[in-house]
Amino acid sequence: MKLKNTLGVVIGSLVAASAMNAFAQGQNSVEIEAFGKRYFTDSVRNMKNADLYGGSIGYFLTDDVELALSYGEYHDVRGTYETGNKKVHGNLTSLDAIYHFGTPGVGLRPYVSAGLAHQNITNINSDSQGRQQMTMANIGAGLKYYFTENFFAKASLDGQYGLEKRDNGHQGEWMAGLGVGFNFGGSKAAPAPEPVADVCSDSDNDGVCDNVDKCPDTPANVTVDANGCPAVAEVVRVQLDVKFDFDKSKVKENSYADIKNLADFMKQYPSTSTTVEGHTDSVGTDAYNQKLSERRANAVRDVLVNEYGVEGGRVNAVGYGESRPVADNATAEGRAINRRVEAEVEAEAK
């Protein structure tokens, strides 16, 4: 009956622990365990090896040090006498200090323990009478494995040494056991404090601290670089140079890719605009070449606007005739270079 009551208390405690919200390990936590052990008696005692079932409750003084009180009852214990076997009753109460290795949390935590125990045995004599009590020193070691922050399984090995000398000397016994349990109620580790941003002086309010500001008097609303100086915008540009056959204003197929590149750039920088400039070589009259250069400029503009979707208001077309050569018109090679349309677009990179 005592064993049933003990196990009932332990099981009830485990259920209650599982319903709690404030589960934690470490300092101030409580640990409750149910165990079963195989008890190996000293050879000088008139008792056979037996089983010990019970439970324990422990309190963590620190993250690693636990003080645990346990109670167990011997099960199926028999004495050996000349008159035959006698069923023996008994219990064992222990108080142990336990030191855990490792860090609280999920995983394996080895431990060592030491403490005192009180053993109470009845029906010890061959006439089914008598009581034997003994105070014993405990020493042990084992492993706990935490499946979660709170639930664990344990394997243990404990030795006991009788402090009171009997007729047959001091008695030494040992136990090997398994257990399961919960721990709860500890205080969670305090979260690390939020880093405090360094406070610096910024006299010109440009966002750069005075101790690294190389331009400490920057006017308000001026964009600055990492040194606190007015940012210099990076200028990016695209140039276009489309060549034409003699006396022609039709854009050749091999020039479309270059025109598309210019159109893509203008779409990337929608505030830009451009002037498409048409040119000719020196063959023909000035008036004819002027008209030809304008047709060439308008042909390229049409491709930009109609083929590649650049807004018409952003593209201007102008012809310069033969007035702006870039090569010698006295040679065929030079005249081929001069039959051209040019355009350029600049933008400030953000």
Curated annotation (Swiss-Prot):
Membrane topology: Multi-pass membrane protein
Record InterPro entries: Bact_OuterMem_StrucFunc, OMP/PagP_b-brl, OMP_bac, OmpA-like, OMPA-like_CS, OmpA-like_sf, OprF_membrane_N, TSP_type-3_rpt
Any one GO biological process: regulation of cell shape
Record GO terms (molecular function): calcium ion binding; complement component C3b binding; porin activity
Subcellular location: Cell outer membrane
GO cellular component, one term: outer membrane
Primary location group: membrane
Ranges in coiled-coil conformation: none
OmpA-like domain sequence ranges: 231-349
UniProt region (3 X 2 AA tandem repeats of X-P), positions on chain: 190-195
Keywords, sorted A to Z: Cell outer membrane, Cell shape, Disulfide bond, Ion transport, Membrane, Porin, Repeat, Signal, Transmembrane, Transmembrane beta strand, Transport
Keyword Ion transport: yes
Superkingdom of the organism of origin: Bacteria
Post-translational modification: Might contain two disulfide bonds.
Stored SUPFAM superfamilies: OMPA-like, OmpA-like, TSP type-3 repeat
Signal sequence, renumbered to the chain: 1-24
Domain comment quoted from the record: The N-terminal beta-barrel domain (residues 25-184) when reconstituted into lipid vesicles is blocked at both ends.
Database matches in PANTHER family: LIPOPROTEIN YIAD-RELATED, STATOR ELEMENT OF FLAGELLAR MOTOR COMPLEX
Function: Has porin activity, forming small water-filled channels. Also has a structural role in determining cell shape and ability to grow in low-osmolarity medium.
Family to which this protein belongs: Belongs to the outer membrane OOP (TC 1.B.6) superfamily.
Name of the featured protein: Outer membrane porin F
Gene, per the UniProt record: oprF
